[in-house]
């Protein structure tokens, strides 16, 4: 039988247990028609790239399926009728990778990693509290840890 991967996005208002119920229904429907679910991953509640049916977030689920094309069309019909499913996409694949997919592999990485120096800070206020104006010479000031020795020498001369 051909192999398929199906990614479905469920509404953010439903709970994870309800998302599991949707995935269980798909699994039961595929297995009742002599198919098999080889892989099932819950990617979590994620931001959508754009609004879908007035939703900005959705629960993502990946299913790896081994089923006949008629079974897949019936599964897609059932997903289309379910009001809790915002979108789904099923593609045919050569093989189903047993390793965790990319979103799950990235989950272990630190999302708030240091992005490095991003340029000088725009001028805000002087230490005295007076706001910086257009007539002030110092438009930008670098953080102390990024200032070079040359900058420090110029500041000492002034």
Curated annotation (Swiss-Prot):
Residues 98-158 are annotated as: Disordered. GO terms for biological process: translation. Residues 106-117, 127-150 have a biased composition (Basic and acidic residues). Keywords: Ribonucleoprotein, Ribosomal protein, RNA-binding, rRNA-binding. GO terms for cellular component: cytosolic small ribosomal subunit. One of its GO terms (molecular function) is small ribosomal subunit rRNA binding. The keyword Ribonucleoprotein applies. Binds together with bS18 to 16S ribosomal RNA. Belongs to the bacterial ribosomal protein bS6 family. This is Small ribosomal subunit protein bS6.
């Amino acid at each position: 039988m051909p192999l398929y991967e199906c990614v479905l996005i469920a509404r953010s208002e439903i709970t994870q247990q309800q998302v599991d119920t949707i995935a269980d229904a798909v699994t039961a429907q595929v297995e009742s028609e002599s198919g098999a679910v080889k892989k099932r991953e819950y990617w979590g509640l994620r931001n959508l790239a754009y609004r879908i049916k007035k939703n900005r977030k959705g629960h993502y689920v990946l299913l790896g399926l081994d089923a006949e094309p008629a079974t897949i069309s019936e599964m897609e019909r059932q997903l289309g009728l379910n009001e809790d499913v915002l979108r789904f996409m099923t593609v045919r694949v050569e093989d189903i990778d047993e390793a965790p997919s990319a979103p799950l592999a990235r989950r272990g990485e630190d999302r708030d990693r240091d992005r490095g120096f991003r340029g000088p800070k725009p001028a805000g206020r002087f230490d005295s509290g007076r706001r910086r104006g257009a007539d002030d010479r110092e438009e930008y000031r670098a953080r102390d840890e990024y200032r070079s020795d040359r900058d420090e020498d110029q500041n000492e001369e002034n």
